[in-house]
C-alpha cells in the first residue's frame, strides 16, 4: 500500500547518540536536563523523553503544565521542571502530577495552601530580562540572598534547584561571562553559608559547548540534542528530524508558462515540474518560494513558483524519479540533503522556529 502523506522522520538512535556525545564533554557528576518543551521542538515530546529515560536522563524541561502532565501520563520518570509560569489555580494539579515549578515572583506563593508541598527551582534574571528574580547588578545580590533564606524557612516549599538563563551564549561571550559572574557570586555566597538549594544550572546547548566553567550541577540541552550545533565548537551530532513530502504529480510546462499564485516564476524553457504535498500550512514558509533547493533521490531540486497552503512545486527536469517518490525538505547534510540551518538562514530566523513550525498534518514517524 502506498502512503503519500508527508511526514517527519524522527531518528531515535541519532537522538540517543547525540546525548551520549554531549555527556562525554561533561564531568561525571554533571547531569543533563533534556529540554522537551514545545513538543520537543516539534520532534514529539513523549517519544523523545522515553528515549532520554532509556539512557539515564532524569531531568526534563517543559514550558507548561499541560506539557508536564503529558509526560507523566506516558510514564516518564524523573524530575519534570516547568520552565514557564503556571496559573495559581494550577498549583494543586502540578503537585498531583509531581511537577516542579519555576519561581520568579514571591507573590505567587500567596496562592500556595499551607497543606501543599510545592517543589520549585528559583530562577534568577542575570540579564535576559524575562522570567526570574531581578539580579542584573552586584548590588542586587543581597536582596536575592535574603529572599532565598526566607524561602528556605517556608515549610511548604521545597527548593530543588536554582538557575539562570543566558541571553546570547552562542554569540556574545562578554555578556555571557558577565551573567556567569553575577550568578556565581550568588552561588558562592550560598555555598559559603552551607545553604542547600538543590541543583545549580545555567548552561543551555551553546554555553555547554563554549563555557564549560558554567556547567555547575546540570546543563539544559535542547537544540544540540536534536543534532543542531549553532556554535563554532566541534562535536559530533546528527540531525534527528527529516521532513519529507511526496511527489504526487508531474507535468510538462512549456517555455513562457507561469507557475503558482502571483505568477512569480516563468519558465525560460520547457521544463518538467513536480507537485509536492507540503505547503505553508505544514510549516514550509512562503518566503522559501523560488529561493531554496530540496532533495529528490539524492539530487538537488529547486523550489519554483510560490509555495501555497497545501503544495509546492519543484523543477525535476534533469532528475531520475517515479511518481510518489519522497522529496526531502531538510535533513542530513551527509546525504546531500538541505540542512535546517540553511533553511533558517534563508528565512532570516533560527532553527528553533523552523522546527516548531512543522505542522500537525506532517505526521511524526519514529525510526531506530
Residue ranges and their predicted role:
Residues 2-11, 16, 67, 86-88, ...:
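Active-site anion/phosphate-binding pocket segments in diverse small-molecule metabolic enzymes
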Residues 26, 75-76, 358:
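A broad structural signal for alpha-helix termini and local helix breaks/kinks
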Residues 24-26, 41, 265:
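Short secondary-structure boundary/capping segments within folded domains
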Residues 2, 6-9, 16, 30-201:
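Active-site-proximal beta-alpha core segment in soluble small-molecule metabolic enzymes
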Residues 19-30:
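Glycine-rich phosphate/diphosphate-binding loops that line cofactor/substrate pockets in enzymes
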Amino acid at each position: 500500500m502506498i502512503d503519500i502523506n508527508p511526514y517527519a522522520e524522527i531518528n531515535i538512535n541519532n537522538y540517543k547518540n547525540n546525548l551520549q556525545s554531549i555527556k562525554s564533554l561533561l564531568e561525571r557528576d554533571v547531569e543533563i536536563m533534556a529540554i522537551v518543551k514545545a513538543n520537543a521542538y516539534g520532534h514529539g515530546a513523549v517519544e523523545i523523553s522515553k528515549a532520554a529515560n532509556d539512557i539515564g536522563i532524569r531531568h526534563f524541561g517543559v514550558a507548561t503544565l499541560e506539557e508536564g502532565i503529558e509526560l507523566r501520563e506516558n510514564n516518564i520518570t524523573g524530575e519534570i521542571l516547568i520552565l514557564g509560569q503556571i496559573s495559581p489555580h494550577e498549583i494543586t494539579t502540578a503537585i498531583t502530577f509531581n511537577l516542579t515549578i519555576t519561581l520568579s515572583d514571591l507573590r505567587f506563593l500567596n496562592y500556595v495552601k499551607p497543606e501543599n508541598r510545592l517543589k520549585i527551582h528559583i530562577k534568577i534574571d542575570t540579564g535576559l530580562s524575562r522570567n526570574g528574580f531581578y539580579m542584573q547588578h552586584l548590588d542586587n545580590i543581597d536582596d536575592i540572598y535574603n529572599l532565598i533564606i526566607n524561602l528556605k524557612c517556608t515549610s511548604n516549599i521545597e527548593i530543588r534547584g536554582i538557575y539562570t538563563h543566558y541571553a546570547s551564549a552562542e554569540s556574545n561571550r562578554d555578556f555571557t561571562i558577565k551573567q556567569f559572574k553575577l550568578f556565581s557570586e550568588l552561588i558562592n555566597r550560598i555555598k559559603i553559608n552551607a545553604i542547600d538549594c538543590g541543583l545549580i544550572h545555567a548552561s543551555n546547548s551553546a554555553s555547554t559547548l563554549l563555557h564549560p566553567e558554567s556547567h555547575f550541577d546540570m546543563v539544559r540541552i535542547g537544540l544540540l540534542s536534536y543534532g543542531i550545533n549553532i556554535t563554532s565548537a566541534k562535536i559530533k551530532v546528527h540531525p534527528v528530524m527529516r521532513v519529507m513530502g511526496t511527489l504526487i504529480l508531474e507535468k510538462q510546462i512549456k517555455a513562457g508558462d507561469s507557475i503558482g499564485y502571483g505568477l512569480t516564476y516563468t519558465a525560460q524553457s520547457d521544463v518538467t515540474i513536480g507537485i509536492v504535498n507540503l505547503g505553508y500550512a505544514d510549516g514550509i514558509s512562503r518566503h522559501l518560494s523560488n529561493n531554496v533547493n530540496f532533495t529528490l533521490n539524492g539530487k538537488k531540486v529547486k523550489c519554483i513558483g510560490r509555495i501555497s497552503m497545501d503544495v509546492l512545486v519543484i523543477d525535476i527536469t534533469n532528475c531520475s524519479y517515479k511518481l510518489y517518490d519522497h522529496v526531502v525538505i531538510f535533513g542530513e547534510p551527509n546525504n546531500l540533503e538541505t540542512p535546517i540551518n540553511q533553511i533558517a538562514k534563508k528565512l532570516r530566523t533560527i532553527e528553533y522556529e523552523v522546527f516548531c513550525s512543522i505542522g500537525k498534518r506532517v505526521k511524526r514517524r519514529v525510526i531506530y
